[in-house]
Amino acid sequence: MQPQLPIEVDAQTGVWTTDGLPMIYVPRHFFVNNHVETEAAVGREVYAPALYKAGHRSAYFWCQQEAATHGLAGMAVYEHYLKRLSQRGWGLFSFVAADPVTGHAQVQVDHSVFVLAQGIAGVPVDRSKVCCLFAGWFSGAMDWVLETAGSALRTTSAESQCAAEDGAHHHTHCVFTVSPL
């Protein structure tokens, strides 16, 4: 299978774009090793909230741009977001459930980059919830949907299960739960 994303490369600058947004193409182990070492240096209690805020802001911006680029609205933008994340190698993202009126959603992530990279190229094995980078993405997208529908409701998102977790019940995928603040 070939990539499903349109990729343009500027001949003058070498900048890659998809749907008009600049992209960076890096090996998975490079990104995950940088992520893991940053978390180790500053601690998850500091790093996770910073990732959440940045991810929320980026997802909101992405939804705004993609809605304009493709003429999409509402949950179609959020669905397109999950499709594009899946096409970019982060994992396979799908809704278990979603309600744009109440701000509730559950997003399933199969084959998360953070789970698959463990034990490869120096990435340590961690049997906890390791996919926290995604959390802000899902509330950012839902908040965009809510705001553009005229709702004042805002959401939060958290990883409720991770395929990396070790314990009585091994999970084959990760789940993120989006709920109103």
Model regions and ranges:
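Active-site or metal-binding loop neighborhoods of secreted/extracellular toxin and effector enzymes
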Residues: 145
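N-terminal accessory segment detector
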Residues: 1-132, 150-157, 162-175, 180-181
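Mixed-charge, glycine-accented linear interaction segment located at domain edges/termini
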Residues: 138-141
